[in-house]
């Protein structure tokens, strides 16, 4: 999966 820098990543 790609890192979506639009959602809060944990």
Swiss-Prot record:
List the Pfam families: Sulfakinin
InterPro entries xrefs: Gastrin/cholecystokinin_CS, Sulfakinin
Q: List Sulfotyrosine occurrences by residue.
A: 5
Detail the disulphide connectivity of this chain as listed in its UniProt entry: none
Show the GO cellular component annotation of the record. Answer: extracellular region
Origin: domain of life:
Eukaryota
Q: Which residues carry this modification: Phenylalanine amide?
A: 10
Under Gene Ontology molecular function, one entry of this record is: hormone activity
Q: What does this protein do?
A: Changes the frequency and amplitude of contractions of the cockroach hingut. Stimulates muscle contraction of hindgut.
Task: State the protein's name.
Answer: Leucosulfakinin-2
